[in-house]
């Protein structure tokens, strides 16, 4: 049985963590990005399918390439963030299943059903995006996930000629708490959950 994490760790990961809109002028190293991935990759996915593919946009040239796809409300904070992660999903993720899930012929589950493959890739890449957020928090970084962007423009700019499709964007860095909005409410257990 696993041990519960400390109350301090719970605050870091959940109750005191915030979505950030402003950033300190502190770089995020490539080594730190590797650490983030090396933590998040252990999060579970269906049949270990691991469909997420990530582009860490961290150069001025990369940000300019991303700029046309951003909504007006997300433009300034994304250009200012040290890193923006494009979380994409590989539409042919199943080609890696003989390596990732050697217990059976999982590849055939998806080659025989394109709809199932797409649903699985999209759902599980979204789960992996959440793991990335928690990996960042565990390493002392802050995040700002976003869906306010033009997916087609991102795909054309970054993934033309590949099997990748964008899912969401996550700004990563060291947040400026002076620019954090007031804490918003969450649904109660009674509003969000049922017991059967």
UniProtKB/Swiss-Prot annotation:
Xref: SUPFAM superfamilies: FMN-dependent nitroreductase-like
Cystine crosslinks: none
Named cofactor requirement(s): FMN
Gene3D superfamilies (UniProt xref): NADH Oxidase
InterPro entries named in the record: Nitroreductase (IPR029479), Nitroreductase-like (IPR000415), Nitroreductase_HadB/RutE (IPR050461), RutE-like (IPR023936)
Entry annotated with the keyword Flavoprotein: yes
A Pfam match: Nitroreductase
Keywords associated with the record: Flavoprotein, FMN, NAD, NADP, Oxidoreductase
Physiological role: May reduce toxic product malonic semialdehyde to 3-hydroxypropionic acid, which is excreted.
Family: Belongs to the nitroreductase family. HadB/RutE subfamily.
Protein known as: Probable malonic semialdehyde reductase RutE
Originating species: Enterobacter sp. (strain 638)
Originating gene: rutE
